[in-house]
Amino acid sequence: MLLHIPNVLNAEQLRLVRERLDQAGDAWVDGRATAGYQGAPVKRNQQIAEHTPVARELGDVILASIERNPLFISAVLPNQVYPPLFNRYEGGMQFGSHVDGAVRVLPNGVKLRTDVSVTLFISDPADYDGGELVIEDTYGVQQVKLPAGDMIVYPATSLHQVTPVTRGARIASFFWVQSLVRSDTQRAMLFDMDTAIQRLNASHADDTARRSLVGIYHNLLRTWSET
């Protein structure tokens, strides 16, 4: 399931993030440092070094925002979230086709299974040319270039790439989530069911039917979830 989540960061948060990243200086390093065996040969970008003060500060801003975002919670069903990273593409930089690594190691040494990949756009689309996130999924090839503050979530199993940036700079945050439900198909069904329940709540539909659907949702989540 590929899902666009709008307005994850507000204007004030975007201003703060951009200001801190503009001032990051030597914290920007070669992005190949975090790429795996498959990704390193096709990756040309810059990243904020992991575990630096600016990475932790801005990562906390993003984590606080997604924890309050009901659409993100419903669609992703997060169990563990990898600390957000930040990248920059400019001057022809790109990231060729690749699939994200299956496992990342959290700062505390705990391993995280990458079920869901997340990109949060920090630059406005008008500020750069190129830089589309191209995702190949079961419905074909999707090109993604969203307003600043908006997020795209998609299965980490997807083949994807970032096209060359030919003007300006494309700055974004990216990270991975281990979901309570590892199957994308099952997560999508639960998301559709939760969306239907919310619509029933808003329409004041038959309460017995609504309670029944809520019960089915939680029983499926209980059956499929891993904690």
Swiss-Prot record:
Domain of life where this protein originates: Bacteria
Keywords: Dioxygenase, Iron, Metal-binding, Oxidoreductase, Vitamin C
Cofactor: Fe(2+); L-ascorbate
Residues reported to bind 2-oxoglutarate: R170
GO molecular function, one term: 2-oxoglutarate-dependent dioxygenase activity
Residue ranges constituting the Fe2OG dioxygenase domain according to the UniProt record: 80-179
Record PANTHER family: PKHD-TYPE HYDROXYLASE YBIX (PTHR41536:SF1)
Protein name: PKHD-type hydroxylase Bphyt_7102
The organism of origin for this protein: Paraburkholderia phytofirmans (strain DSM 17436 / LMG 22146 / PsJN)
Upper taxonomic lineage: Bacteria, Pseudomonadati, Pseudomonadota, Betaproteobacteria, Burkholderiales
